Amino acid sequence: MSGNLPNTDDVLLQVPDVRCLRSAAETDHPPRILLLYGSNRECSYSRLLTLEAERLLRYFGAETRVFHPTGLPLPDDAPVTHPKVVELQELVEWSEGQVWCSPERHGAMTGVFKSQVDWIPLNSGAIRPTQGKTLALMQVCGGSQSFNAVNQMRILGRWLRMLTIPNQSSVPKAFLEFDDGGRMKPSAYYDRVVDVMEELMKFTLLTRGNSDYLVDRYSERKESAEELSRRVNLQNL
């Protein structure tokens, strides 16, 4: 046992070690960022805000993909082999970080957005496709500024075991913040979007090569060791 920690296993209880962390320079490809938005409207301000975020991320050096939710079936209303479901899940696995953007409707994120998250599995075989990946949150409001949608999405990010960055963006009266060409106008709200994407890139560069180590847990190492022991014992019967 570890000193005065009689309930722990010496072999499995590891002291965190900075030498186990990889340098950002050791990863030889641009950060891979997936962007999701929560509206199928032809004039979708969450989509326009997402595209502004994508432009910033590309400027910062990221490789980006935007998933367009039109045609995605409701959860459990189609098999996981549906082409849009396959597309979404493959993009989730490809990504090292994500941006989520939803309108706030009736005080909550939209069903369009939640349906996308509900198609993301917590486990895919032995892989947790979102665990340890970074996440940035944004929302658009039709009226005064609110944070209900981003707060709800923050909870979802925690359930998916993602590293949600501290900063976030909420754009009130979004219909006033974009020009006729669909570009966001200069404002403090735009500056906040810049801040959020800059922060997402920094967190992704810091963590993407280290996510497996950062989320390696004592309880899961212990469980894995016990499962291995059981398998060996069964083979010896």
From Swiss-Prot:
Q: What is its EC number?
A: 1.-.-.-
Q: Which cofactor does it need?
A: FMN
* GO annotation terms (biological process): protein homotetramerization
Question: What family is it from?
Answer: Belongs to the ArsH family.
- What InterPro entries has UniProt attached to this entry? Arsenate-R_ArsH, Flavoprotein-like_sf, FMN_Rdtase-like_dom
Q: Which GO terms describe its molecular function?
A: ferric-chelate reductase (NADPH) activity; ferric-chelate reductase activity; FMN binding; FMN reductase (NADPH) activity; oxidoreductase activity, acting on NAD(P)H, quinone or similar compound as acceptor
Would the keyword Secreted be found if you checked this record's keyword annotation? no
Assembly and oligomerization? Homotetramer.
Query: Which species does this protein come from?
Result: Acidithiobacillus ferrooxidans (strain ATCC 23270 / DSM 14882 / CIP 104768 / NCIMB 8455) (Ferrobacillus ferrooxidans (strain ATCC 23270))
Residues binding FMN are S39, N40, R41, E42, C43, S44, Y45, S46, S102, P103, E104, R105, H106, G107
How activity varies with temperature is described as:
Optimum temperature is 35 degrees Celsius for the ferric reductase activity.
Keyword Transmembrane helix tagged: no
As for what it does, the entry says: Has NADPH-dependent FMN reductase activity and high NADPH-dependent ferric reductase activity with highest activity for Fe(3+) as substrate. No activity with NADH, iron trichloride, Cu(2+) or Ag(+). May be involved in cytosolic ferric iron assimilation as an NADPH-dependent ferric reductase in vivo.
Q: Which UniProt keywords apply?
A: Flavoprotein, FMN, NADP, Nucleotide-binding, Oxidoreductase
Q: Which NCBIfam families match?
A: resist_ArsH
Cited Pfam families: FMN_red (PF03358)
* Protein name per UniProt: NADPH-dependent FMN reductase ArsH
pH effect summary = Optimum pH is 6.5 for the ferric reductase activity.
